[in-house]
């Protein structure tokens, strides 16, 4: 293999294996009105072009259903196709309407085929259902939850639904708070998942020392606890953030300066290294929730409310704390999906848990979801406008999390027989987790073998 070919292959591997970074997107605005395709497309375009960043090109969805419909596929899908935004699909699993989620998934596969498949990072069955079903969730009036056996049943339904389709290789997981993951009664869900989604918000850990100076340690601790029970499965950061405005939670003050600090200390080490979906791009349109986590204000703009640039020191910290293992990279590559990230990533939980499944009148409406949220922190309370909540992902938050150093760089470079230079390149690039540094090292190893 020629030198130029080696370099090209190494860079291609590095690019394809970089972790996904994006935001959470609900199917409604902060007033409960349904988002349209143009709304999603504007958000995805903004996220890709945020000043000070390399672009946030992935979207985590809470539901497959378009707001205001029974089971029409969410218009975020054609918007993502148009903007080339990768997708962590979500099916809402609380409230007894799962058949409509499955129907929307089937229709989306039929309608979008390869265009959808090439964008799918994975599929999440549920979001914080186990937390809402817990003693703490009930006490916090977090909304309808689901028991672990039902989540496992839903996961199996999704596997059956996608079998033999364009999405047959998509990894399936569940998103919940770290407190739910470490609860042994939920272990069957871990067994059923290909990956675990971690939601964590130190801001809401108000029974602990949770000032901004404590936030990274709290996040890291909760991620580590989640990874400890994950049985070797990847943990993805599916929700975390710090509010730009809102009430003070014990020692946690919601303001722009602290949101920036949290971004620097927690976000920057994750971005590009661990699959991460931040909470949230915008939650103040048209109504500003309390607390508000949006990094842009009420007007959608590529100019954020605070500086999003990450320093070199943050990047260096990332390479030492969130490098996926070679096995997780290989597994991701084998799926043939939008596995731009084979991250064994840190994961935790306790996001703004959408107390979904209820309409404004308090009964399940089976369509668009109302939009308040409560959360998974210790002794959480309903914190946004209504007591119902939703797959909208647009307000409130809670819980705790931890950034955990996950994964290890396990490059495989030797064997009993002399491998070819191309094999060395491929193995080294996989083992070094797709970073540019890994690609450079891979090239050096390959050249040394020539």
Curated annotation (Swiss-Prot):
PTM (free text): The GPI-anchor is attached to the protein in the endoplasmic reticulum and serves to target the protein to the cell surface. There, the glucosamine-inositol phospholipid moiety is cleaved off and the GPI-modified mannoprotein is covalently attached via its lipidless GPI glycan remnant to the 1,6-beta-glucan of the outer cell wall layer.
Organism: Neosartorya fischeri (strain ATCC 1020 / DSM 3700 / CBS 544.65 / FGSC A1164 / JCM 1740 / NRRL 181 / WB 181) (Aspergillus fischerianus)
Xref: Pfam families: Glyco_hydro_17 (PF00332)
Family: Belongs to the glycosyl hydrolase 17 family.
EC code(s) of this entry: 3.2.1.39
Cellular component GO terms, alphabetical: cell surface; extracellular region; fungal-type cell wall; plasma membrane; side of membrane
The name this protein goes by in its record: Probable glucan endo-1,3-beta-glucosidase eglC
UniProt catalytic activity: Hydrolysis of (1->3)-beta-D-glucosidic linkages in (1->3)-beta-D-glucans
Swiss-Prot/TrEMBL keywords: Carbohydrate metabolism, Cell membrane, Cell wall, Cell wall biogenesis/degradation, Glycoprotein, GPI-anchor, Hydrolase, Lipoprotein, Membrane, Polysaccharide degradation, Secreted, Signal
Glycosylation sites: 183, 365, 371
Region of interest (Disordered), residue spans: 380-420
Functional summary from the UniProt entry: Glucanases play a role in cell expansion during growth, in cell-cell fusion during mating, and in spore release during sporulation. This enzyme may be involved in beta-glucan degradation and also function biosynthetically as a transglycosylase.
